[in-house]
């Protein structure tokens, strides 16, 4: 994580034996640097507008693969983590809003499990590691909920989903599964300093993995080697999990937006699109770089398209700040793409506005400019970034990574972390489909054929929105620095 390891230091002094001393308070790895679970719980309660009630969440449970005795890879429920900071299975959590008490319930000690896979989390250990008021074993959960409910005329427990109620038989309890999710989504949209540090650290590891790939790409023969080098670097730095499946797409595979086979020979393919990001303490990074296998562009076409996407990204990032509509930046990216593709002769026969309205630019840039990043790589928010407020751009669809769609386009707020990931692609299926549509009159298919071997170019960074601008959290080299890194 970024930031100083020292919270404060005392005055220097001398002990009775004449030895000098100084005291430094270290915050890393101590109670002063815990994940801020209680503040998150308070924020959610405030968002709910409540002064009383009980929030209940359950962690992901231990599971085995279908028809197997092998464990399913564990991935913590993100809403549970947001209110606990706990990355352990089979736990439960309550937050008593009125009393401001956050309680974790952990599994009983299991000797057999301790022998085979190691001991489970104990209450005393949980209190040391996490920002809690209390930690107890699971057998106390039912009793404690009953005690809490007995002191209230109309006790209401707030849960995420109908199927995630605590295992308690009490007819007098009311469960609300409608309000908690949107309240948590609203809170998760804005990241605090601790969360930003986690995303920053995930980006640091991802940057070093991207650099390692660039350093070795000249001698790699297969997409699988790219995948392996990236993963190896992340794991060796403590990031065992990826935020999403690694995309190591060479040549025309780079035109497949979520290509994950990663098993084809590199041969004479012009470019590699590597979309890969490490996860750190459940927080994601999302980074894409597109590069040649040598420290120079293998063709005019590849250099041209990289330059187009680079301009799209730079101008959109420079436009980020609080109060800006992200949708407007998405439309700006399309305008830049159209201007540049017109100059290259790929688009033709219309003005920038005419082509934008036709939707022809979507053939080459078919996805949204970006999304929120946080506990999910496509993180939650109460309103999707890519919602349209007007039906002005009929050719551009409602582009959103997550439902629900809305007719109110949101404005950026300080504390949001968003990706900026424009791309230009030459997808054979997309081009074949375009030939049958009226928008084909704006596309010079003969010129396009020269660009097919480029496949696709995407450049993606994770960017923190601030009150007066932005901070780019992604440090992986791009452009000239990227080419210099290839040896």
UniProtKB/Swiss-Prot annotation:
It catalyses: Release of any N-terminal amino acid, including proline, that is linked to proline, even from a dipeptide or tripeptide. SUPFAM superfamilies: Creatinase/aminopeptidase, Creatinase/prolidase N-terminal domain. Its EC number is 3.4.11.9. One of its GO terms (biological process) is proteolysis. GO terms for molecular function: manganese ion binding; metalloaminopeptidase activity. Keywords: Aminopeptidase, Hydrolase, Manganese, Metal-binding, Metalloprotease, Protease. Signal peptide: none annotated. Coiled coil: none annotated. Residues 1-22 are annotated as: Disordered. Binds 2 manganese ions per subunit. Residues 1-10 have a biased composition (Polar residues). Its cofactor is Mn(2+). Mn(2+) 1 binds at residues 286, 421, 460. Mn(2+) 2 binds at residues 275, 286, 460. It holds the Pfam family Peptidase_M24. It comes from the Eukaryota. Belongs to the peptidase M24B family. Catalyzes the removal of a penultimate prolyl residue from the N-termini of peptides. This is Probable Xaa-Pro aminopeptidase CPSG_02684.
